[in-house]
Amino acid sequence: MVLSREEIIKEQLGRAVKDILEQLPWMAEVFRNPTYDLNKTVESELDFFLGAVLSEILERYTQYLLNKQIKPSAEEFAWINQTLFSRANEFKDLIRKIVQV
């Protein structure tokens, strides 16, 4: 079965989200490592993790699309960003649960 461009874009976004959320325990370990003193410059662990998760998802997603040789249009990027950022509260809840922030 050949997926449509829209199906590929949606499927790859879901894949990127899943992959990055699975990396949250590692991100927490790095962030909380006293060697780096990040807790002195980052005021909110939760917002730090949210920013890290969103940036990692976008990076991973971009790689998935490049591998499929798809360059999203401006409208598709708008949809991608809206879809991702509209889930910020959901991601925060997952971050709280996974890394106990």
Where in this protein do the model-derived segments appear?
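Extended alpha-helical scaffold/tether regions of large eukaryotic proteins
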Residues: 4-10, 39-42, 81
